[in-house]
């Protein structure tokens, strides 16, 4: 049985033909290579059912397979990725630091909540 990372590597090896961020769709060719990857990645649906559900002309949307079946947690820099816990911890730390900075800025300029009076000068 393949690990999630191995499944994601297989999906990332496909040629992404069309990427539609607004619909969260990433299309690949409906060919033997894609069918082989789907056969290794899918575990809750058959390859034929998947293709029937997610085909658009001669293309297949690979996004659901990558996210729901292969264990990807996002799409970054043109590839599906698994984000390590450190990524989320770093994001929380950065957000915490930004909140602290903005709070200090408010206090420094004596800005009251929900007012812009202190910023208009």
Swiss-Prot record:
This is SPbeta prophage-derived uncharacterized protein YorW. It comes from the Bacteria.
């Amino acid at each position: 049985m393949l690990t999630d990372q191995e499944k994601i590597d297989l999906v990332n090896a496909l040629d992404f033909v069309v990427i539609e961020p607004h619909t969260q769709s990433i299309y690949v060719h409906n060919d033997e290579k894609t069918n082989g990857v789907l056969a290794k990645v899918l575990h809750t649906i058959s390859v034929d059912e998947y293709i029937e559900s997610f085909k658009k002309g001669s293309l297949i949307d690979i996004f659901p397979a990558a996210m729901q079946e292969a264990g990807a947690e996002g799409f970054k820099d043109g590839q599906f990725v698994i984000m390590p816990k450190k990524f989320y911890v770093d994001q929380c730390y950065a957000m915490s630091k930004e909140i602290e900075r903005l709070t200090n800025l408010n206090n420094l300029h004596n800005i009251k909540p929900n007012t812009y009076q202190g910023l208009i000068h």
